Swiss-Prot record:
SUPFAM superfamilies: Aminomethyltransferase beta-barrel domain (SSF101790), Folate-binding domain (SSF103025). Transmembrane segments: none annotated. Folate binds at residues 27, 189. It is found in: Cytoplasm. The keyword Nucleotide-binding does not apply. This is tRNA-modifying protein YgfZ. Belongs to the tRNA-modifying YgfZ family. The gene is ygfZ. It comes from the Bacteria. It holds the Pfam family YgfZ_barrel. One of its GO terms (cellular component) is cytoplasm. Keywords: Cytoplasm, Folate-binding, tRNA processing.
């Protein structure tokens, strides 16, 4: 039987989130398999995949020749190759770009819609899953595989789990958790990713930013020691010549409408407002608060005031759960 996504509810901030099971239908899975899969991927993404163990998942960027990201990927080893999770809106163009040089390599690159992506977060998430799986991932071992299921562990903004599994297990999980967990859709996971400062690259922002403009260096997503990959020269230049002047920021406050991906905001300058930044993602929480993930200059004053264009409400900067010092 097919697996049906859960209906939406207004998302909640991590500090107040009850136990919640989410369908992650705005995210999508893809795989690379074959004898050359590690070597091929190593030449295409910013992370050092040759150093990855079975116990790790990594954030990485897949860039064009100018170092601009087609997408960012949550990578893990899968079977005899690798799998990654990215926003569904960018998967098709990202895979088309990744396949461009694959004709000379023994690899198969494909979308994977057979498996289901679920998120578990909120109050006592670990205890709830411990009743179902014999082993759970943790800080020391961030990926655990059990049967048809792969579990990924995330620390921020509060402990949570991403589950990659087959339809039968997804239905079993839903049945077991239905009584104690709230059910929600991708918007809740998106809200948690915004709070965690994990960059969200949707179609509107694909091909727009170098990885450092979205804090990937602070999230362990760029290796400056590995060999060549597409876009490496520009990514290295941004680090060693200080060419990157942008960073990912978290804003909270209120707005009469949600800004869309690719839209700019306005920064208060004395009595006036000046357009600034590019929105990556925004969500309205159940308490009415709006959270916005935006790329702006990396030297913003911490007490700066922003607004959605021409709006009467304001947004301010919230600290991210990680440091931008490399």
């Amino acid at each position: 039987m097919a697996f049906t996504p859960f209906p939406p509810r207004q998302p909640t901030a991590s500090a107040r989130l009850p136990l919640t099971l989410m369908t992650l239908d705005d995210w999508a899975l893809a795989t690379i398999t074959g004898a050359d899969s590690e070597k091929y991927l190593q030449g295409q993404v910013t992370a050092d995949v040759s150093q990855m163990t079975d116990d790790q998942h990594l954030l990485a960027a897949h860039c064009d020749a100018k170092g601009k990201m087609w997408s960012n990927l949550r990578l893990f080893r899968d079977g005899d190759g690798f799998a990654w999770i990215e926003r569904r809106s960018v998967r098709e163009p990202q895979l088309a770009e990744l396949k461009k040089y694959a004709v000379f390599s023994k690899v198969t690159i494909a979308p994977d819609d057979e498996r289901v992506l679920l998120g578990v977060a909120g109050f006592q998430a670990r205890a709830a899953l411990a009743n179902i799986f014999s082993e759970l991932p943790s800080k020391e071992k961030q990926v655990v595989k059990e049967g048809a299921t792969t579990l990924l562990w995330f620390e921020h903004p509060a402990e949570r789990f991403l589950i990659v599994t087959d339809e039968a297990t997804a239905n079993m999980l839903t049945d077991k958790l239905r009584g104690e967990a709230e059910l929600n859709n991708s918007q809740q996971w998106l809200a948690l990713n915004i709070e965690a400062g994990f960059p969200v690259i949707d179609a509107a922002n694909s091909g727009q930013f170098i990885p450092q403009a979205t804090n990937l260096q602070a999230l362990g997503g760029i290796s400056f020691k590995k060999g060549c990959y597409t876009g490496q020269e520009m990514v290295a230049r941004a680090k060693f010549r200080g060419a990157n002047k942008r960073a990912l920021w978290l804003l909270t406050g209120s707005a009469s409408r949600l800004p869309e991906a690719g839209e700019d905001l306005e920064l208060k300058m004395g009595e006036n407002w000046r357009r600034t930044g590019t929105v990556l993602a925004a969500v309205k929480l159940e308490d009415g608060q709006v959270v916005v993930q935006v790329v702006m200059n990396n030297d913003m004053e911490p007490d700066s005031i922003f607004r959605v264009r021409d709006d009467a409400n304001t947004l301010c900067i919230e600290p991210l759960p990680y440091s931008l010092e490399e």
